[in-house]
Every structure is written in C-alpha cells, then in structure tokens.
Amino acid sequence: MMTLNLQTMSSNDMLNFGKKPAYTTSNGSMYIGDSLELLESFPDESISLVMTSPPFALQRKKEYGNLEQHEYVDWFLSFAKVVNKKLKPDGSFVVDFGGAYMKGVPARSIYNFRVLIRMIDEVGFFLAEDFYWFNPSKLPSPIEWVNKRKIRVKDAVNTVWWFSKTEWPKSDITKVLAPYSDRMKKLIEDPDKFYTPKTRPSGHDIGKSFSKDNGGSIPPNLLQISNSESNGQYLANCKLMGIKAHPARFPAKLPEFFIRMLTEPDDLVVDIFGGSNTTGLVAERESRKWISFEMKPEYVAASAFRFLDNNISEEKITDIYNRILNGESLDLNSII
C-alpha cells in the first residue's frame, strides 16, 4: 500500500492508497474500503480533524453493520489508536455516539461511556469537552419501552465526545457564535435602559462590558439540531433512483459546528465512517480539504448525490451512480 505525501496533494488527487477514489471534488475524495487499513496511509501527525459517527452499538443488528455491545468498545479502540497517531498535535477527534439499551430490558447500556474512559486511559486522548446533540425531531424509540409499554421517554440525545491529542487543541469559538436573543440585542443597543450593573451572588461583577457586541453569544455544549432532511438533494435522488438512503445520517449542522470551530481553510478533515458523506460535503463548503472512507459501494455511489447540481438530469444521476457502483473513479467537477 502506498503512502500519501501531503506536501504534493492536488485538489483532485489528494491521496494515493494504491487505489483510486470512488469520486473526487475540488477539495476532497471519497474512497471505498476498510478505513482501518486506509488510515495507515496517512503520515503521522497530518490530520487536523477526524469527524465521524460510527455504526452504533444497537442491540438489534442494522443493515449498516454493527457489533454486539460487548465487542464494540474493543472494535472502536482499534480505530482510535491509529487516529491518535495520524492527528496533528493540535488535532481533534469528534465522535457522535447514539444511545442504546441492554438487550431485552429497559436499562441503558453505558458503552459510550466505556469508550470515553478507555480512550483516555488506554489510547492517551484528552477529553477536550463533552457535547450533547439534542434532536427534537427524533422519533420515539425504543418502541418496546416508549410506545408499547410507555415506561421510558424517547431517546433524543446523542453523546458527542470531543477528544484531543494534547491538552491544547486548535479551537476558536468565535467561529460558532450563536445569534443574540432579542433581549440581548436590546441591551446592546441601549445598556443603560435595560441593565443595572451589579455584583451577583457568585461574585461576578456584571458591568457594561457585558453589553458589548461580540458578534453573537457563546454556544453551550448542548447542540439542538433537528435531523430532518426530507427535502434535501441526497434523499430526493435516492428516491428518484429507487435505492435506500443510508439509515444513520447526522445533519450537516453537526459537523459544520466542529469543522468551523476546530479547523481553518485548507486543513484536512477526515471521516472514517463516511456513510452518505455529510462530513465531506460540509468540509467542501467550508473550503477544507477532506477525505472520507466507507466500506459499502452502494452508500458511496449514493453519497455523490450530495455534490450534484439541483438541475442535473435523471439520466446523468443514474449514470454517475452506476459508474461509481461499477468501480469507476469519477471527477465530479468534470461531470457537473
């Protein structure tokens, strides 16, 4: 297997794994293959961010592939050890983990917390911060405990662990500021009318500096993002083709938050469980270099839909999908 040279990357030939990418864009490439093997081709300390959502450790085996919960942690750590070597010293590894229940009983699995502890104790990562993704549009689950027996509320929050290689990862929260509330906007416009400086019980001196316009408010580590893509290009073309969409897609706003906060333009972003390649699409929009890996050819072929123009013909969509599925390597820029 050949190893890439980051110093000689071009926009459409970013890697050389001894195999061609399924498709390329201006900033990135999507590969079909085992990400554990493909990861080894990166030079050590070359990646700025690995942003991914691995197959969840669900008790019912899904078509996108997952292991029994007791095997899951060891399996995931085999990837994490390689990621740790390939990250830059100021690099980050952000992982979205879905919740799970123990088999047959309404008691939660703690596999995601076992991953967290072992990532720190055994692999050497640091927990830069724990995030929680609240998806208000998530359907009630699991059905047995929520819908049928009605003894548990719906599971609508995923843990998102932000790991870093060192204690000081690259980060800039000014890139992800949230819009001010209406009340805060009024305070900024006329602080004397809406605010009286005082010292709070905590000892913080709340003065006029708190009315300064900093471009937005500091976001919390609870990210409220709906996962509803019903009108998106990807799902529309999957429906047009009569093929199944990837069953576990996170919304673009999730990787967007971390890509903006943890990287700069031209930094390299990698998704080791690419799926429908949401991470690659966001990295492309944000002018980051990107590489995504996915084992299933049908998911890779469909993921190309994310990069197509809205007015592209059905014939062209079908042609692109089938050519990727048949093993061709496509430059989407030249086709679009």
Swiss-Prot record:
Q: Under which EC number(s) is this enzyme classified?
A: 2.1.1.113
Regions of biased composition (Basic and acidic residues) lie at 202-211
InterPro entries xref list = DNA_methylase_N4/N6, MeTrfase_CN4_CS, RM_Methyltransferase, SAM-dependent_MTases_sf
> Do the record's keywords include DNA-binding?
yes
**Single Gene Ontology BP term?**
DNA restriction-modification system
Short name of one Pfam family: N6_N4_Mtase
Q: Which SUPFAM superfamilies match?
A: S-adenosyl-L-methionine-dependent methyltransferases
Which keywords label this protein?
Answer: DNA-binding, Methyltransferase, Repeat, Restriction system, S-adenosyl-L-methionine, Transferase
Q: Region entry Disordered: which residue ranges?
A: 196-215
Enzyme class (EC, first level): transferase
Recorded catalytic activity of this chain's protein: a 2'-deoxycytidine in DNA + S-adenosyl-L-methionine = an N(4)-methyl-2'-deoxycytidine in DNA + S-adenosyl-L-homocysteine + H(+)
Q: Which GO terms describe its molecular function?
A: DNA binding; N-methyltransferase activity; site-specific DNA-methyltransferase (cytosine-N4-specific) activity
Residues in sequence repeats: 11-113, 181-293
Subunit details for this protein?
Monomer.
Similarity-based family = Belongs to the N(4)/N(6)-methyltransferase family. N(4) subfamily.
* Protein's name according to its UniProt entry: Type II methyltransferase M.PvuII
Q: Which organism is it from?
A: Proteus hauseri
